[in-house]
Regions:
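Loop-to-transmembrane helix entry
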Residues: 1-15, 94
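Residue-level signature of mid-helix packing/kink "hotspots" within the transmembrane helices
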Residues: 13-22, 104-108
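Cytoplasmic membrane-interface "Motif A"-like loop-to-helix N-cap segments
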Residues: 29-43
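C-terminal ends and interior cores of transmembrane alpha-helices
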Residues: 42-55
Length: 169
């Protein structure tokens, strides 16, 4: 792929990410931030896994549209999701700082790890794509666990029982 096409793909991902940043946040006001963040992370993981099947430039543009929407959703819902898991709002800033510090290490280490995987697999991207998709799916599972703990606490405080599928978190 030439340089101009790669820049166009970057513009497409960021451009289609705009509705991905706005619409899920609007829905999060009604259904809960974590309840919107989990499917967004799952959809992004599926998109990254499906990247392995993309073989042509037009298909890559289509893939960028889907991934841009899901990635934009994650980027905008993530900080709001952190605050929704915090019960004591005086600690929200400290918790966000701690989480963003942890995320910064992952952001710093992710590209070299992906590069090492690409080098080890002879220049193909399949291993790095699988690594990225698995990381997103693991993140979704961990968000589901955090949601489960929060819902259990909320239901215990309210004196109710059940699975808590309709709890806004």
């Amino acid at each position: 792929m030439d340089y101009t096409s790669s820049l166009n793909l970057l513009l497409v991902i960021n451009g289609v990410g705009i509705p991905g940043r706005v619409i899920p946040n609007h829905l999060a006001d009604r259904y809960g931030t974590i309840n919107m963040l989990m499917p967004a992370a799952g959809a992004a993981g599926i998109c990254v896994f499906s990247w392995m099947a993309v073989k042509s430039t037009p298909a890559l543009y289509v893939w960028c549209c889907f991934y841009g929407i899901t990635a934009g959703s994650i980027q905008s819902l993530f900080p709001a999701g952190l605050s929704s898991l915090t019960t004591d709002l005086r600690k929200a800033g400290v918790r966000m700082g701690m989480i963003f510090t942890i995320v910064s290490f992952a952001t710093l280490a992710g590209p070299p790890i992906a590069g090492a995987i690409i080098t080890a697999s002879g220049g193909t991207y399949y291993g790095a794509q699988a690594f990225a998709g698995a990381a997103l799916m693991l993140g979704m599972v961990l968000m589901a666990a955090a949601r489960g703990v929060k819902v259990k606490r909320l239901m215990r405080e309210a004196g109710t029982t059940g699975w808590g599928w309709h709890v806004k978190v």
